[in-house]
Amino acid sequence: MNNVERKMLDILKELKEVYNIIAIKAEFEAEGSRTDELVMLNEIIFRADLQLFIKIGGCEAVRDLDQCRLLGASGIMAPMIESPFAMKKFVGAAKKVYEKEWQNMEWIINAETVTCHKNLEQILEEGKGFLSTVSIGRVDLSASMGLSRKEINGEEVFGLTKDIATKAKDYGYKVNFGGGISIDAIPFIQKMYPLNDRFETRKVVFHATDDEKMLKGGIVKAMEFETLYLKNKCEYYDRMAVEDQARLKMMAERLEIAGSDLVV
């Protein structure tokens, strides 16, 4: 582990011990995480004794599910589940890849559009016996409502988020929400409690609470972790980008000389 990764590990240990986090999240979807990034992240998560949740690229992303299995993910989230058919496809793909082991996993869907809300009860019915958690994605949900990101903490988004959460709870599912979670989202988080079981930043999944001090401290620490994660990722790819530059320059010079020798 390098120095940045050690700092990341220290923050995760503090987040777990003080701020009651559950898991670290990665994405094959919007974030587009690559396997080498996930391997590096997974080592830190393992040392912190936390779970890894991964959002796959779609309801039937079998290759992503294979990668999740290899990485030992504890929870898998499917994005943009907008119909009972999409839910059915997710169930089928999960059972195909995990076979009998699917029962040992936490299966999560993203409820993140007005279309999903419209079809929610049918989706939740289709997920019976398989689905564990409904995670509400506020960024896409607000966009699908025709609202700007500035309105993500407003009453319209809160009302729809609460309705989705209530219906999910009626079916016995756990409820999580995220998207645009920063200090200014604290009043929204407090209003949702205790209807939700969890909330999440881009990378960190927390147990639900309405304690303002815990929320502020936890969100700031999550932001520190995410900043270091991005720094480590950038430095890793910067090293890869420059490691062959000296040889590339030498080969270009040799080629130029060799080419000039061919000129008659």
Where are these regions (language model features)?
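Expand to "…catalyze enediolate/carbanion chemistry for C-C bond making/breaking, isomerization
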Residues: M1-V264
